[in-house]
């Protein structure tokens, strides 16, 4: 039985790592989309910036862009 438990723990750890990798890939993809929209990912948009979307990363959830001056 100890061999089966070691395999189970190894498989569980591998699944957790895979879940983290796929989340990171999505965050990188959203950051690239924000760059294409001429924005940047920040924790909070500054007063002279407008929120144009979400980066959905833990530390930088908003995609911010400078407001256009009329």
From Swiss-Prot:
Gene (UniProt): DEFB107A
Name the job this protein performs.
Has antibacterial activity.
Chief subcellular location equals: secreted
Q: Which GO terms describe its biological process?
A: defense response to bacterium; innate immune response
Q: Which InterPro entries match?
A: Beta_defensin_dom
Q: In its UniProt entry, what is this protein called? A: Beta-defensin 107
Q: From the Swiss-Prot or TrEMBL record, state where the protein is found.
A: Secreted
What does the tissue specificity note say? Specifically expressed in testis.
This protein's record includes keyword Signal: yes
Q: Which cysteines are joined by disulfide bonds?
A: 41-55, 45-64
Please provide, in alphabetical order, the Gene Ontology terms of the cellular component aspect for this entry. extracellular region
